[in-house]
Amino acid sequence: CAECHAEAYRQWLDSDHDNAMDVASDTTVLGDFDGAEFTHAGVTSRFYRRDDRFFVSTEGPDGQTGEFEVRYTFGIEPLQQYLVPFPGGRLQALPIAWDTERDRWFTLNPDTVIAPDDWLHWTRNGQNWNGMCAECHSTNLQKNFDPDTGTYATRWSEIDVSCEACHGPGSRHVAWASVDPDARESIDNVGLEVVSSDLDNRQYVDLCAPCHARRSEIADYDHSQSGLM
């Protein structure tokens, strides 16, 4: 996309959409992983590094303290969360996040003590990235949940919210744009499934609300059937 839409790409680069999710690295992790500790409800969590990898020592699914590797960052501001891989293709969101405005660790549940067997515990389904969060932080997300085994084989085209997340599949548009302008055929919306200019209020809702709203997902997103209202 950047080859033709350089200014749009420049504005997107390092935006909230670009930083919606990323691989944990020196440049993407904002939290203090230099031995910082945070205590809540009697549980002390420690954040540290080993070589170029990031870890947290905290309460696990059995109620015992364990070591967990942080593989991905989630979001950028005003807070950044961290995702930990679990068996079955699952990614789980830690309940402690980094406050990027005050440069401190804080809990997302300050007034609640959540037991390890609770649905809301960070290792359980309530904090499962695949089912609860993934669709709106990556592009062309396919959960690939297997109900028989209870496992995920989740895939994406782009790890973050990239061009096709809002504009829809772009291959037809790219093929059209690659032809000499004088030889291009006349096609609807320059080959894109989603109309994204000169929108009325309802069209804006249909385009943005699938993610910027409190709702529940019942199937993988389909740009050709995106109407909410």
Predicted regions and their residues:
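Primarily the internal scaffold of c-type cytochrome electron-transfer domains
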Residues: 6-75, 81-86, 103, 107-119, ...
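Conserved oxyanion/phosphate-binding beta-strand-loop segments in alpha/beta enzyme cores
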Residues: 88-91, 100
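Short hydrophobic-aromatic micro-motifs
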Residues: 91-93, 207
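Short acidic-aromatic active-site loops that bind/stabilize oxyanions
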Residues: 122-130, 201
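C-terminal substrate/ligand-recognition segments
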Residues: 128-143
